[in-house]
Regions:
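Short beta-strand/loop segment that forms part of the nucleotide-sugar
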Residues: 68-80, 101-105
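Short beta-strand-to-loop acidic/aromatic patch adjacent to the donor-nucleotide binding site
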Residues: 143-155
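N-proximal low-complexity "stem/linker" segments adjacent to membrane-targeting elements
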Residues: 1-62
């Protein structure tokens, strides 16, 4: 294995020996000075459906043997009160004693969301980002100094993986760590969004910016490319960093988090989760429905990346830019698909090259065009409006007086407002506005803990 470092802003920790299995005692000692809390965002279907329940139960069995976690917060979405009680029964059955159930549909946490919304912090959009954001508030209310996130659909989870994930932040004082792993299951390659969208898109952007010598754009692109698995949901934050961060509330949450880390952190690590393949629940392919599945995820990811370049570095988007980027993306994706086909043959894996090419052309290409249209359409709108005015003599005197220049200048000054990814504010900002909010959250947690203890 090549364990050389390729980016000075990112440390990569590889599994070079079995010595990593002995790090749990170090984590226990470190947790005495750094209160450590794990967040598990989950839908009710993770434990109520026959298909998902064994995966969730295995996660509970593994977590019951982890000794350095002060609390485990289960951020529960789309659940009834009865399903929240069912979760409490499961946690007790499998020996999870230090749990907190954060039922976002329950009256207690609804009241917290209402307080935040009434104060002007828009947290209306449902999803993983909103769920995690509230869990981070709960963790802070409980005094956490180190906060981890673990997805609830990992089919191959073992507690050793969690130990590795926490080690950089808890034991080595990094600000952030992120898991990477091999996505292989059922004798085939997975990780389609990473392999067929994120990597070729980032490489296409890098190719474009290298051609014109735009180094300021390359810094962010190179940073994102340095992560071996940008879309992994398994991360750990030092609380001092987490409090300053914003979080996306759409499918771009993982990429957006990396961009926020790029902006705000200096001591960052990625950790090899396991030497064995990693598997979790897969998104459905839905080219006919732009609001679901991989298509929606792809649009959100592309929008998040381009938005960061627009807001952070002042990238100007035009029809030509989007079209040229799409053509470059298709070329790069074709090159990578050839390499994946060769690698699959080398490793005797099943590989459907036609299906991968269809996904690139039928879903991801259209997602890039759709996201590009979102960014470029305001420019076309102004241009079309000016053409309409110039075709009518009644408006010529206004155009002669500089109306067109005023409109274009106004658009340029305000273009950053057109590219905002749906996101939360930082917890630092909330605490400035609502200094008692953590006390309110703590009161809800205590009340609901007493309830779940009796059921």
């Amino acid at each position: 294995m090549n364990f050389s470092k390729k980016n000075t802003k990112l440390t990569t920790l590889y599994l070079l020996s079995k010595g990593t299995e002995e790090i749990a005692p170090t984590l226990r000692l470190s947790s005495r000075r750094k209160k450590t809390i794990l967040v598990v965002p989950a839908l009710a279907t993770e434990f109520t459906t026959e298909e998902n329940r064994p995966v969730f139960v295995n996660i509970l069995k593994q977590l019951s043997k982890v000794t350095y976690l002060s609390k485990i917060i289960f951020g529960l979405d789309k659940a009834t009160d009865e399903e929240a009680v069912e979760l409490a029964h499961l946690l007790k059955k499998y020996g999870i004693k230090n749990y907190v159930i954060q039922n976002n549909e329950g009256e207690g946490f609804k009241s917290i969301f209402k307080t935040l919304n009434d104060a002007g912090f828009n947290l209306e959009q449902p999803g993983k980002g909103k769920n995690m954001f509230m869990s981070f508030g709960v963790a802070q209310a409980l005094g956490a100094k180190c906060i981890g996130v673990l997805d609830a659909d990992i089919k191959t989870f073992h507690r050793r993986q969690l130990n590795r994930l926490f080690y950089p932040v808890l034991a080595l004082d990094y600000e952030f760590s992120k898991a990477f792993y091999t996505r292989i299951g059922e004798h085939r390659m997975y990780g389609r969004v990473k392999r067929l969208l994120v990597d070729p898109l980032l490489l296409s952007l890098k190719r474009k910016f290298c051609d014109v010598g735009d180094d300021k754009f390359l810094r962010l692109i190179d940073y994102l490319l340095a992560f071996n698995y940008q879309l992994s949901g398994e991360v750990v934050f030092d609380t001092s960093l987490l409090k300053r961060m914003h979080f996306a509330t759409n499918w771009g949450v993982e990429i957006f988090t990396l961009i926020e880390v790029y902006r705000r952190a200096n001591n960052v690590a990625q950790v090899q989760f396991d030497t064995k393949p990693f598997d979790h629940k897969h998104q459905v392919i839905s080219p006919e429905d732009k609001g679901k599945g991989l298509y929606k995820m792809a649009i959100d990811i592309v929008t998040t990346i381009i938005s960061a370049l627009v807001v952070e570095e002042g990238l100007e988007i035009s029809d030509y830019f989007v079209q040229d980027l799409t053509v470059t993306y298709l070329n790069v994706a074709d090159e990578l698909i050839k390499k994946y086909a060769d690698n699959a043959a080398f490793s005797a894996l099943d590989y459907d090259r036609n299906a991968e090419e269809e996904m690139v052309r039928g879903i991801f290409k259209d997602a890039i065009l759709a996201a590009g249209d979102y960014f470029a359409s305001p420019y076309r709108l102004t241009e079309r409006f000016l053409r309409l005015l110039s075709s009518d003599g009644r408006f010529h005197k206004y155009l002669d007086q500089g109306l067109d220049k005023d409109l274009l200048e106004y658009e340029k000054k305000n273009q950053s407002q057109l590219f905002e990814v749906p996101q939360t504010v930082s917890w630092d900002r909330i605490l400035m506005r609502l200094p008692k909010i953590l006390h309110d959250i703590s009161a809800v947690v205590k009340k609901e803990a007493a309830f779940y203890a009796q059921v």
